[in-house]
Amino acid sequence: MVLFAPIFCPILPANAEPLDMNAYRGKVVLLDFWASWCNPCRKSFPWMNAIAETMGPKGLVVIAVNVDHNRELADAFLQNNHAEFKIVYDPSGKIAKQYAFRDMPTSFLIGKDGRVRYLHSGFFPERESQYYADIVSLLDQKAP
């Protein structure tokens, strides 16, 4: 069974626009949950930067949701791990609860129809080709 991705109202920096998952219908979304204490998250950021750069023009949107309770920890992480994609802060865990995941990081690939199509628990560099193939398969599908 394929589920629709939950629509959420995230906590964003004061100068950011609200983020509505409905705004991304017709695009493929890589929604990644991460935390400052997560070592595999550090490894995933360069890959997400590269995939956002190469696949963004083809319709991929990368959104990384931070689940730290302390925003300063997330900001310190981002000073050392540059992000060329959207960052959302979820210190209360409201967004994370809607997606009900256990591992860190966890990525959800959401199809153009707004349904969760793939779930990747953890980040493993040796699986990057599979992550890429999953994204390409969704980008190749026609929008509803």
Predicted feature descriptions by range:
Residues 109-144:
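Thiol-/selenol-based redox modules, centered on thioredoxin-like
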Residues 75-113:
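Short, internal strand/loop/helix patches
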Residues 33-50:
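Conserved redox-active cysteine motifs that mediate thiol-disulfide chemistry
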Residues 1-10:
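Bacterial N-terminal signal peptides
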Residues 27-29, 59-61, 86:
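Structural signature of beta-strand start/N-cap positions in the alpha/beta core
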Residues 30-32, 64, 108-109:
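Hydrophobic beta-strand core positions in alpha/beta domains
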Residues 27-29, 33-37, 103:
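Short pre-active-site segment immediately N-terminal to redox-active cysteine/selenocysteine motifs
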Residues 10-29, 55:
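A short beta-strand-turn-helix
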